[in-house]
Amino acid sequence: MKVTLPEFERAGVMVVGDVMLDRYWYGPTSRISPEAPVPVVKVNTIEERPGGAANVAMNITSLGANARLVGLTGIDDAARALSKSLADVNVKCDFVSVPTHPTITKLRVLSRNQQLIRLDFEEGFEGVDPQPLHERINQALSSIGALVLSDYAKGALASVQQMIQLARKAGVPVLIDPKGTDFERYRGATLLTPNLSEFEAVVGKCKTEEEIVERGMKLIADYELSALLVTRSEQGMSLLQPGKAPLHMPTQAQEVYDVTGAGDTVIGVLAATLAAGNSLEEACFFANAAAGVVVGKLGTSTVSPIELENAVRGRAETGFGVMTEEELKLAVAAARKRGEKVVMTNGVFDILHAGHVSYLANARKLGDRLIVAVNSDASTKRLKGDSRPVNPLEQRMIVLGALEAVDWVVSFEEDTPQRLIAGILPDLLVKGGDYKPEEIAGSKEVWANGGEVLVLNFEDGCSTTNIIKKIQQDKKG
């Protein structure tokens, strides 16, 4: 089964922000300079790549979506190189040329895949008349599904508040990659995407995930944001929205070579996915997968649809994590043809905690593929009471599907997954807790088919109920 990517070809996004040219000089290093204690690089390769807001636009078109880029440049070779490079990848450029300023350029010198130095050539565009930028935004609003404002504090977004108001008036979502500590200037945006360092520079050091959520929700309220996405490097990313439970997604990066431009990739994929008509939760899932790909590349890079598809599939031929029952049966049949052992478990998995993660990792070690069956919202309510679930089914399944230990996630409507298990007939059925094997739903069917049933222990002290009680006690205190 192929992963269903968003319909990127129908997505139109405008990117407005600080555009720049990234230059890379590569070469071997074998000696130290006699003039100073620095390495001598014998340059043998020179590359030029669009950077800043231009890299955001390239990330959008690399997915097959349509991107129009607006920014400030000089009238120079760097501007011409930018325009040519972007035209080659189908980015529609609509630059405002400023004859008194040079195009922002950053030169990096690298040897043996290590960056030795960066040299910046820039004066910034503070004080430049923003009206031509506003006119370009106004002209495009009727034909785009999202507006990205890419802020590198170089002057293109000096009038960012007016830009936000233009988009809000037209009903177009505004996504902003912020810069600096003055988030007041982004008031009214649809989504801000700070990294953890940028976030903590505004709200203070956060020692726990709970502090990130609490301070993030206050920031949303203070600045009238619709949502906040905090990218947290090896900790993944956290989506916060008023009236909804936090959505924490673990990182999907396997190796990290260079984080240059990773933020551009995240906001580019977010915008393209939203403009294609997908939900914000889905957009974050795809952006998280794309970030895991791009940090494994050197320098500012983009992600192709094939790379994104492979990333969200996680394991080459096994399909997308979240599946329908029919899709799951096909995936299981294919796994069995390859001689793989299929393990299955089930639960509510409302607020994912360390006990869940440890349990699922241990279950996965018992076979080659792990299926997690999840109670629907109605099933959870019948099982746990009217106040549950805290997290809706879609969010619970997305988070489970992002875990490395989990291959496939499927939901069921009944009080128990007996019917579902009887249809799948895993090689091994596991359940956490104090059950006896014969008490586990589906055990009779699995045994009758020659399979095994096993009870695994949960980590002591970890439970969703205890987490909820602690939150309630903290609020009272």
UniProtKB/Swiss-Prot annotation:
Q: In which pathway does it act?
A: Nucleotide-sugar biosynthesis; ADP-L-glycero-beta-D-manno-heptose biosynthesis; ADP-L-glycero-beta-D-manno-heptose from D-glycero-beta-D-manno-heptose 7-phosphate: step 1/4; Nucleotide-sugar biosynthesis; ADP-L-glycero-beta-D-manno-heptose biosynthesis; ADP-L-glycero-beta-D-manno-heptose from D-glycero-beta-D-manno-heptose 7-phosphate: step 3/4
Domain of life of the native organism: Bacteria
Q: Where is this region: Ribokinase?
A: 1-318
Q: Which PROSITE patterns match?
A: PFKB_KINASES_1
Reaction(s) catalysed by this chain, per the record, are:
D-glycero-beta-D-manno-heptose 7-phosphate + ATP = D-glycero-beta-D-manno-heptose 1,7-bisphosphate + ADP + H(+); D-glycero-beta-D-manno-heptose 1-phosphate + ATP + H(+) = ADP-D-glycero-beta-D-manno-heptose + diphosphate
Region Cytidylyltransferase: start-end pairs: 344-477
Q: What is its EC number?
A: 2.7.1.167, 2.7.7.70
Which residue positions does N6-acetyllysine occur at? K179
Q: Where, by residue number, does ATP bind?
A: N195, L196, S197, E198
An example GO biological process term is: ADP-L-glycero-beta-D-manno-heptose biosynthetic process
HAMAP family (alphabetical): HldE
The Swiss-Prot or TrEMBL record describes its family as follows:
In the N-terminal section; belongs to the carbohydrate kinase PfkB family.
Task of the protein: Catalyzes the ADP transfer from ATP to D-glycero-beta-D-manno-heptose 1-phosphate, yielding ADP-D-glycero-beta-D-manno-heptose.
Q: How does it assemble?
A: Homodimer.
Query: Can you say what this protein is called?
Result: Bifunctional protein HldE
